[in-house]
From Swiss-Prot:
Null allele phenotype: Decreases COQ3 O-methyltransferase activity.
Name the UniProt record assigns to this protein: Atypical kinase COQ8, mitochondrial
Subunit-level organization: Forms homopolymers. Predominantly associated with a complex of about 500 kDa.
Biological process annotations from GO: phosphorylation; ubiquinone biosynthetic process
Gene of this entry: COQ8
Record annotation: effect of changing Q137E: Abolishes coenzyme Q biosynthesis
Source organism per UniProt: Saccharomyces cerevisiae (strain ATCC 204508 / S288c) (Baker's yeast)
Cellular component terms (Gene Ontology): mitochondrial inner membrane; mitochondrial matrix; mitochondrion
Length: 501
């Protein structure tokens, strides 16, 4: 009897939740949209046979990229979120009734994240672009053991699955931004984008001067619907109860709101590009695209076309090359924090290209670039320095000063946090003449072992700077591990980051 009552209560919850989610369609709950992340503008070919290669790429793009209009108004986006919520809720309710009729006791998460619902969510996010895709990208850098595996599958699938604008919508955007005669400003402009991402798509083009460029075009309506889209997404994620409380979803959403608005400001991104171009102009390992201001607006950025290949798609790269790439990206990450106090925080590996001809790493997508306050940088450098020294007392005190801990946590929570901090410092510890082998590292696994306890017992969200900073660090660590790289982390840390404590 008790079991049946529990089953009926669960089904009632499913039914009520699906009705709650449908209220979005009636405008009773506000919604939100937007973001940017770029799925890189790269070319593999050399100049010889350029026309044939590019024609071949056009055909490949037609096969791999889907076209669909971007919902531009707040009402239309609200409707799409509402229909998604209703569809997921009703599908879950129907499946729940079917399972109970068979004598099974399905869990809430298994009903929400059924195969059909995973497909439904992925397809809708790809059509919506904007916030839906960006939140997916942000959360996808959480460890897969933190999130339900079905949700992690959705997030992984949506990372690079945006549809692109149909031709008519594209031409309307270009005419609005560059004028009715916009086509005369280019000697070439590929109609099919090289890539389509969360807030925009990228087209190969050529200026009348012969300069090869890429044109990054923001989807219409994405910027204006950030707040409403985020509100809708927050409601969906909260109603589904899919995320652990320790993720502090409201803080994650607030951070995403800020970053999305940054990334939708293409003039801001253009300034970030120019800043990094100046910072790295004499760096032998890096190259940054040059911005063409006369072809750049609030919603379009035109920049030089990088000729490298995504680092994870390098054909038969030697281990020496992989070590070179990994070590220099790690160096840049440390310099961004300690020296520049200004970081490109997007961890997407497709932001890094390697040019075999110039032997340089080409950097892309600066929409998520941000400054860090001097006080935060000072304390964070001290924290990691204590970690490399295995100084538990110093690491704990600095964690409280930074706001990671309140001091009121259980001893097990304090110990788990300090253990994780000291583990994070491990690659940067030891002999400066020795490299750290990421291929056999267990740092991620050991930090992962504390995640469950920390999610359950965390009393406060981490400082807002941490969301983007640790996302970048996590992405770089994973990159080095995927490359199987050996990196002189201790040497880099001592030269760039260490603070005398």
């Amino acid at each position: 009897m008790v079991t049946n009552m529990v089953k009926l209560r669960n089904l009632r919850r499913l039914y009520c939740s699906s009705r709650l989610l449908r209220t979005i369609q009636n405008g009773r709950i506000s919604s939100v949209s937007s973001i940017s992340l770029s799925k890189k503008y790269t070319t593999k070919s050399a100049k010889e046979g350029e026309e044939n290669v590019e024609r071949k790429h056009e055909e490949e793009k037609k096969d791999t990229l889907k076209s669909s209009s971007v919902p531009t108004s707040r009402i239309s986006r609200l409707f799409h979120y509402g229909s998604l919520a209703a569809g997921v809720g009703m599908n879950a309710a129907a499946k729940g009734i079917s399972e109970v009729a068979k004598g099974n006791s399905p869990t809430w998460k298994s009903l929400i994240l059924s195969d059909s619902n995973i497909d439904r969510i992925t397809n809708k996010f790809s059509k919506m672009r904007g916030v839906a895709l960006k939140i997916g990208q942000l959360l996808s850098f959480q460890d897969e053991k933190v999130l339900p595996k079905e949700l992690y599958e959705i997030l992984s699938r949506v990372q690079n699955s945006a549809n692109h604008m149909p031709q008519r919508q594209l031409e309307k955007v270009m005419a609005k931004e560059l004028g009715a005669n916009w086509k005369t400003k280019f000697s070439k402009f590929d109609k099919i984008p090289m890539a389509a991402a969360s807030i925009g798509q990228v087209h190969a083009a050529e200026l009348p001067s012969g300069q090869r460029v890429v044109v990054k075009i923001q989807y219409p309506g994405v910027k204006e619907s950030i707040d409403s889209d985020l509100n809708s997404l927050l409601m969906l994620l909260t109603a589904s109860s899919l995320l652990p409380k320790g993720l502090f979803l409201d803080k994650t959403i607030a951070n995403a709101r800020t970053e999305l608005k940054w990334e939708c400001d293409y003039n801001r991104e253009a300034r970030a590009l120019q800043k990094f171009e100046a910072l790295l102009k004499d760096d032998p390992a890096f190259e940054v695209p040059h911005v063409f201001p006369e072809y750049t607006t609030d919603n379009i950025i035109t920049m030089t076309r990088m000729e490298g290949t995504e680092i994870m798609k390098l054909p038969k790269a030697s281990q020496e090359t992989k070590n070179f790439i990994s070590e220099n990206i790690m160096r840049l990450c440390l310099e961004e924090i300690a020296t520049f106090k200004y970081m490109q925080t997007d961890p997407n590996w497709a932001n890094f290209l390697y040019n075999g001809r110039t032997k340089k790493i080409e950097l892309l997508d600066f929409g998520a670039s941000r400054p860090f306050a001097e006080d935060f940088i000072l304390k964070y450098r001290k924290l990691l320095t204590y970690a490399t020294l295995r100084d538990r007392k110093g690491a704990y005190e600095m964690s409280v000063q930074l706001g990671y801990l309140t001091g009121l946590e259980s001893q097990s929570m304090k110990d788990a946090h300090v253990d994780s901090v000291l583990t994070l410092g491990e690659p940067f510890r030891g002999d400066v003449d020795k490299s750290f082998d990421f291929k056999d590292q267990t740092v991620s696994d050991r930090i992962r072992g504390n995640i469950g306890l920390m999610l359950n017992e965390r009393l406060c969200p981490p400082p807002e700077e941490t969301y983007s900073l640790h996302r970048k660090f996590s992405g770089i660590f994973l990159l080095c591990a995927r490359m199987g790289a050996s990196v002189h982390c201790a040497k880099l840390f001592k030269e760039i980051f260490a603070y005398k404590v």
